[in-house]
Amino acid sequence: MFIRSNRRAKIVATVGPASSSPAILRSLFLAGVDTFRLNFSHGSRDDHAAAYRHIRALEKELGTSIGILQDLQGPKIRIGVLHEGRLQLTKDAEIRFVCGTEPGRGLMDIPLPHREIFAAVKPGDDLLIDDGRVRVRALGVSDEFIDAKVIVAGPISNRKGVNLPGTVLDISPLTPKDRKDLEFGLELGVDWIALSFVQTARDMIEARSLVSDRAGLIAKIEKPSALDEIDDIVALSDAIMVARGDLGVEIPPEDVPGRQKELIRACRIAAKPVIVATQMLDSMVTSPTPTRAEASDVAGAIYDGADAVMLSAESATGAFPVETVEIMSRIIEKTEKHKFYRPILEATEPQIAHTPPHAVATAAADVALALKAPVIVAFTVSGTTASRISRARPPLPILALTPSEQTARQLGLMWGVVSLLSPTVDTYEQSVDRATQAAVQTGLAEKSDQIVVVTGFPFATAGSTNNLRVTQAG
């Protein structure tokens, strides 16, 4: 049995060429990874299937539950092939986007094989090329072309990405490739599906119709239009990822920190986990130590109340994947122990509508704190009871006992929660007995310690959080 209780916030790490071997995956997990991410923008299905098998073997070896997150590529918009493969755009130059894959007749004609863009763009709209390095503004639009003026100059080359801030495209959030990858991931048994480039709440409805309850659904927030519908998107999702890379291209960079705080708050109100992602320790792709700004960025996300922070290239292709996880874990631990951490967390606690389940969860945190209990034990089928207690951010571990293997794995994203597979209980007394035993078996409490036990009645009913008891461990 492996139990990690040295910190509350979680770590997500991306698997790639630098980290796909069984030995490195084991080292990453022991260094602090709680959930592994399979990025389907890169690598083959065989690569991802092999990583999946290695993680599940590690899970069995250590007697623990490890979450696996499948990140779908999404509908990436790209220009086509240029006349000479490369084009230098100068400020105020006029260019023409041509609908199709082939270059137009003129040297300044840029193929754009996405007819939905020509239907959506209006004069005055901006188009960003190559992650925002080049910016052009639409002057005139037809079904076959967009005439534009260069606002920010720079070079472009074949198949560079295009972003359209503020423009909602009439496209599915799932490409044909995504749909095949999705079915592949669900057949493997991934625990989370992350949906890229979510534009509206409708995108989540479409994805849910395919995923159902076979995995948790994560909305990646990287479009301004998603920010406009964030409450509905959170309601339709099981978790949120603050994907700051593309989001920082489509909105001004100075707006990203505030938006990050807003998204974390929205998820905390809804009692759903939120992951802060992108370039958190990016310099560690090539360096054994992070910059001080990167350390502050990780700490800032923890002070904001994020459930998890994520590594991308750092663990997938970097030279120091294990060291990166170790440093990230130490930053989280140090931040959570700082004298300002609790006051900041409590000062930013959102006001939640008073319902019996919320009242019981909040009371559990308050009672545990007053009694100096070492752990709160929660019985949960769907994970909802544990998530409600997690929302209260108690300064002690939450031991979630669940009969569901999927729930145990998914709780690897939830702040402060340690999950343990446990048989379904039939009576209230059985639940208390099991809680007291598990608290000691996991090392989270000692015999005779007072612990707080939270259950729901009727038993094995998802979402019923209505009972609290103080008892002795042992």
Curated annotation (Swiss-Prot):
Binding of substrate, residues: R37, G245, D246, T278
Family of this protein: Belongs to the pyruvate kinase family.
Pathway membership, UniProt: Carbohydrate degradation; glycolysis; pyruvate from D-glyceraldehyde 3-phosphate: step 5/5
Protein's UniProt keywords contain Amino-acid biosynthesis: no
Residues engaged in binding ATP: N39, F40, S41, H42, R78, K160
Residues that, per the record, bind Mg(2+): E222, D246
Residues annotated as binding K(+): N39, S41, D71
PROSITE patterns, per the entry: PYRUVATE_KINASE (PS00110)
Expression induction or repression: By tartrate.
Signal sequence, start to end: none
Catalysed conversion reaction: pyruvate + ATP = phosphoenolpyruvate + ADP + H(+)
Subunit structure: Homotetramer.
Domain of life: Bacteria
Pfam family, one: PK
Site (Transition state stabilizer) residue list: K220
Keywords carried by this UniProt record: ATP-binding, Glycolysis, Kinase, Magnesium, Metal-binding, Nucleotide-binding, Plasmid, Potassium, Pyruvate, Transferase
PANTHER family found in the cross-reference section: PYRUVATE KINASE
Top EC category: transferase
UniProt protein name: Pyruvate kinase
Cofactor(s) in the UniProt record: Mg(2+); K(+)
GO molecular function terms listed in the Swiss-Prot or TrEMBL record: ATP binding; kinase activity; magnesium ion binding; potassium ion binding; pyruvate kinase activity
This protein's record includes keyword Transferase: yes
